């Protein structure tokens, strides 16, 4: 048998001059693996083509990943609306009176409204009382004037009666009696006319609500 050579260093095969041996090929390819495939130029063109036109799946994924902003982040200005305290429009519902289950706030609102209404009623009551007092004062004044008129009429009647007695005692004629009766009638008629004219001038007020 021929003697075999032992190679301690794996790179010694190249130095020894053995080019076609399997050990030399293994030493060259040791640590580096080359891919046996298509050339670089074609692969580069395929990558650029895929980047230029994205697939449908990529578009769907992008749409799904879109960020959603809240109303506070967008800072949308709120419109001027009349909403009671503690009432907010719930998101996703129609506009309307959707009240929150807050009994305290509702009680405060009712108390404010009731106080305003009571104030209006009180003012109406005060006005009605004032008008009633004015009417009573006018009635008292009219009664006083009527009493004064009657007193004057009685005085004139008494004076005329005294005159009649004197005329009878002195033996006066009937003409004097007729004149006295006319004077009494004229005075009484004048008194009633004066009262009627005053009543016409009186102002009537509308009844309070």
Curated annotation (Swiss-Prot):
GO terms for cellular component: nucleolus; preribosome, large subunit precursor. One of its GO terms (molecular function) is mRNA binding. It is found in: Nucleus, Nucleolus. The keyword tRNA processing does not apply. Residues 126-170 form a coiled coil. Residues 1-53, 135-209 are annotated as: Disordered. Residues 20-33, 135-159 have a biased composition (Basic and acidic residues). Its main location: nucleus. GO terms for biological process: intracellular mRNA localization; mRNA transport; ribosomal large subunit biogenesis. PANTHER family: 60S RIBOSOMAL SUBUNIT ASSEMBLY/EXPORT PROTEIN LOC1 (PTHR28028), 60S RIBOSOMAL SUBUNIT ASSEMBLY_EXPORT PROTEIN LOC1 (PTHR28028:SF1). Required for efficient assembly and nuclear export of the 60S ribosomal subunit. Belongs to the LOC1 family. This is 60S ribosomal subunit assembly/export protein loc-1. It comes from Neurospora crassa (strain ATCC 24698 / 74-OR23-1A / CBS 708.71 / DSM 1257 / FGSC 987).
């Amino acid at each position: 048998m021929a003697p075999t050579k032992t190679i301690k260093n794996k790179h010694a095969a190249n130095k020894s001059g053995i080019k076609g041996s399997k050990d030399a090929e293994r030493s060259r390819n040791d640590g580096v693996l080359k891919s046996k495939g298509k050339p670089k130029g074609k692969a580069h063109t395929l990558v650029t083509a895929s980047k230029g036109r994205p697939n449908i799946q990529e578009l769907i994924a992008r749409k799904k990943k879109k960020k959603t902003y809240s109303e506070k982040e967008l800072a949308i200005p709120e419109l001027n609306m009349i909403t009671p305290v503690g009432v907010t429009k719930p998101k996703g519902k129609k506009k309307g009176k959707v009240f929150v289950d807050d009994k305290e706030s509702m009680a405060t609102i009712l108390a404010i409204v009731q106080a305003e209404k009571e104030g209006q009623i009180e003012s109406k009551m005060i006005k009605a009382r004032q008008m009633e007092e004015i009417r009573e004062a006018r009635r008292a004044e009219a009664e006083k004037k009527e009493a004064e008129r009657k007193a004057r009429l009685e005085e004139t009647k008494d004076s005329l009666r005294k005159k009649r007695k004197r005329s009878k005692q002195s033996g006066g004629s009937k003409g004097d009696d007729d004149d006295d009766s006319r004077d009494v009638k004229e005075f009484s008629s004048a008194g009633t006319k004066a009262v009627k004219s005053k009543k016409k001038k009186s102002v009537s007020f509308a009844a309070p609500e």
